[in-house]
Design a protein with these regions (language model features):
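Short C-terminal tail/terminal secondary-structure segment
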Residues: 66, 77-94
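Short, flexible catalytic-loop segment of classical short-chain dehydrogenase/reductase
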Residues: 23-34, 83, 89
Length: 94
């Protein structure tokens, strides 16, 4: 997906079209909560592995998408916007 995003950015840029991707980290969704109950040791381990010490929310991802959809971000293309609480900065322990 990242490779396709970069290719699309190069191919579509001359037409005024930007192409970007969002790279989410652990996001608190119904599926996440079913697999990782709030009081489970694994959930605590996931939170401890995130530098900001919390699980992301759908709103965190939506905010990133909103930024990329805004006309003022028209000079941003071919990028991955990681919404991961800093997990991609280093090696996660999970």
């Amino acid at each position: 997906l990242i490779g396709m995003t970069r290719v699309w950015a190069l191919e579509l840029g001359p037409h005024g079209i930007t192409a970007n991707a969002i790279g989410p980290g652990p996001i608190r969704t119904e599926l996440f909560d079913r697999a990782n109950p709030p009081d489970a040791p694994r959930t605590r381990a996931i939170i401890d592995a995130v530098p900001v010490r919390r699980i992301g929310t759908p709103d965190d991802v939506a905010h990133a998408a909103s930024y990329l959809l805004d006309a003022r971000s028209g000079f941003v293309t071919g990028q991955v916007l990681y919404v991961c609480g800093g997990m991609t900065v280093g090696v996660a322990g999970v």
